Design a protein with these regions (language model features):
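Residues embedded in well-ordered secondary-structure elements
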Residues: 4, 18, 42, 104-106
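Proteins with a high burden of low-complexity, intrinsically disordered sequence enriched in S/T/G/P/A and R
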Residues: 18-19, 32, 93, 167
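Mature N-terminal segment immediately following signal peptide/propeptide cleavage
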Residues: 19-54
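Bacterial N-terminal signal peptides
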Residues: 1-10
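Boundary at the C-terminal end of the N-terminal hydrophobic targeting segment
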Residues: 13-17
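Active-site-adjacent, His/Asp/Glu-enriched structural segments that form or flank metal-binding
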Residues: 55-70, 74-167
Length: 167
């Protein structure tokens, strides 16, 4: 059995007109800071506790001069945080048996950026769960921007953009 945990930042530019029906047994709440969370049993992925941070920010909020910034920041979050300097965040998750790109990933869309990782239930004990929540916390308020990582990510994102260029 798997557990799916999602945390969403408030964003009111596109309010939901009809509430989304959640599966029975879903625990839903809102913290005093506005963070909306869901905890639910999820059969897929099997034997995993999946964490998702859904930030309601994407390319729609960018000006012409900021084009690509949301995607760039998505990449930078894996390059170091307050509690997980440099690549130690990815290294920690990989030490639990996860694979970067498969079990650890993120993407930026038109109106949201989603970070996710799936902790194997073999490792989903108190310490791993605490550290998983700390990762979500750091992604919200603890990303460090290393100039070396910035230069490296520029090249990666430019290559990704070339892959999407229709010309």
């Amino acid at each position: 059995a798997a557990i799916f945990i999602a945390a969403m930042l408030p964003y009111t530019a596109c309010p939901q007109s009809t509430p989304i029906l959640l599966p029975p047994g879903t625990v839903e709440g809102r913290l005093p800071n506005g963070l909306h969370y869901l905890i639910l049993h999820n059969a897929s992925p099997a034997s995993r506790v999946e964490f998702r941070l859904i930030m309601r920010v994407g390319s729609v909020q960018e000006t012409e001069q900021e084009k690509g910034c949301a995607h760039f920041l998505e990449h930078i979050t894996f390059g170091g945080t307050r509690h997980f300097p440099k690549r130690s965040l990815v290294e920690y998750l990989e030490s639990l048996g996860m694979k970067y790109g498969q079990d650890i990933n993120a993407f930026t869309g038109y109106d949201r950026t989603i970070y996710m990782f799936a902790v194997p239930t073999d490792f989903a004990k108190d310490e791993a769960l605490d550290r998983s929540l700390l990762i979500l916390h750091d992604w919200l308020d603890g990303v460090t921007i290393d100039p070396e990582k910035v230069e490296n990510e520029k090249g990666i994102i430019l290559e990704e953009l070339r892959g999407f260029d229709p010309e």
